[in-house]
Amino acid sequence: SAATIQVSPLQLQKAKELLNKEQPIENTYDSWKAFMEDTFTKQISSNLLQPSYSLTTKWDVYIQRIKAKMPLETEWKLLYLFIMYFHTFRLTINSLQSGQISGNARHFLQQELNDTLENMHYLMEQLTRISRPFAFDQFFLGIRQDLKELLHEENPYFHESINVYRNAWTHILKEKTWRKEELDSLQKQLNDQASVTIVIATIHLSLLTEHDEQVESLLHTLQPKDYPLINYWIRYTDEQKATPFILFIIQNIARFFEYETNYYRRKEFVSFFIPYVKKYCLRIHKMETFEKFCETCLPYSFIYYSSYLLQFNKHRKWVELYLYSNIELDYISSDDIKAVQQSDPKLLLPLFMSIVNDKIEN
């Protein structure tokens, strides 16, 4: 008689796992998303109290498992990679808000979140450059729906989320009808209680659909705490489209200072905007506007303003700036002093007098 083969329950379980592993995923957005969410839950969400070295290994396994299922054609691979990082971004934010997370796991996930953002932005730029197969459309429909989740203001990472939203609509969701539909949907949500993310999204889609006329009125609904979100449009749009944002900052810089009392955050804000304000004022030949902006932004604008005044030979104003700022002689560059001396030595007298008086008084 034929020998009977004994198979243990454990072997059966392993064989079942192998079969499940090898099942191909249906080539649809929803199947891919479900597979990712399931893998992320098993590897990451269920292990948020584990030591970070263990989480590092599980993160690598998670990424490898997803990549192993991807199609090999270049353009599809780019799309699938983008979708992988997009959902990883969403799922990581959800995990970071979990009550069951250790300090080490939080630190690890925050680092991964930054890397995920960089990868996503890189892939969006790559996807812009390839011709898009028609079959991408159902995937883009899924991305459009899931992007709406990023507009929830209670998400503590909403600055990063709104930038992902803006980048996706700029780089990969270029179909005019899609953009118009999105703008219509956003405008229905606009009211006095609308969240800042809805306002930012509406401004962005207005720019992309050439509806620039409502940008200015929407900007005025922003609170000073949200002004740093404006730098995205100044950095990434052309000079013409950036104009209303630069003007808004020029007009409202004092409001920002009333709100933001932290020295370094004020300095960072001014340092970002000042080169753009200068470029804009040069273009429209209104340097007095730039000077007024610099004066409002003192002391954070000091270095920029000082070099501008020397560059344009406004030596009297340069001396006044140093007198106002009470800066010691050691901190004034000898080249700067020579430049003023060659132009009009008398201008330096009040500066030297002030410094001598300080020495006598102290």
What are these regions (language model features)?
Residues 5-362:
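Eukaryote-biased, non-catalytic alpha-solenoid scaffold regions
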Residues 1-2:
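Elongated alpha-helical scaffolds
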